[in-house]
Amino acid sequence: MLSPKRVKFRKRQRGRLKGTDERGSSVSFGEFGLKAVTSGRLTARQIEAARITINRQVKRGGKLWIRIFPHTPITKKPAETRMGKGKGNPEFWIAEIRPGRILFEMSGIDEETAKKALSLASYKLPIHTEFVKRSAL
């Protein structure tokens, strides 16, 4: 699963996801992409589950790019622990997603297969997504 090798700070405050994503909002590497329509938090497990689903559909053909990475640690206190006594230890990693962000990109396969694979992958994610094609600019 995806996680950073080293981080500057072990723990982070929650914050909010406001606005849309300007960076990473266009299909750059592949021909087809999966774009976030709503904001949310994707765990490393969810990203991995979507990746496996896409690879199962595509089999050996095509190439896949994962355009997101879980940088943010989520902490959790142990079970049956009283309140207080500081913040819990990092439990897992998430990627904070805003609307407009491209999550996955694909190339080397036909549009129908790409659409089916990305559609099945979208069921594994807790946010609404849409299928996009590379713009002819």
UniProtKB/Swiss-Prot annotation:
Name by which UniProt lists this protein: Large ribosomal subunit protein uL16
Any one Gene Ontology cellular component term annotated for this protein: cytosolic large ribosomal subunit
The family this protein is said to belong to: Belongs to the universal ribosomal protein uL16 family.
Annotated region (Disordered), positions in chain: 1-24
Pfam families found in the cross-reference section: Ribosomal_L16 (PF00252)
Annotated source species: Leptospira interrogans serogroup Icterohaemorrhagiae serovar Lai (strain 56601)
Protein function: Binds 23S rRNA and is also seen to make contacts with the A and possibly P site tRNAs.
Membrane-spanning ranges: none
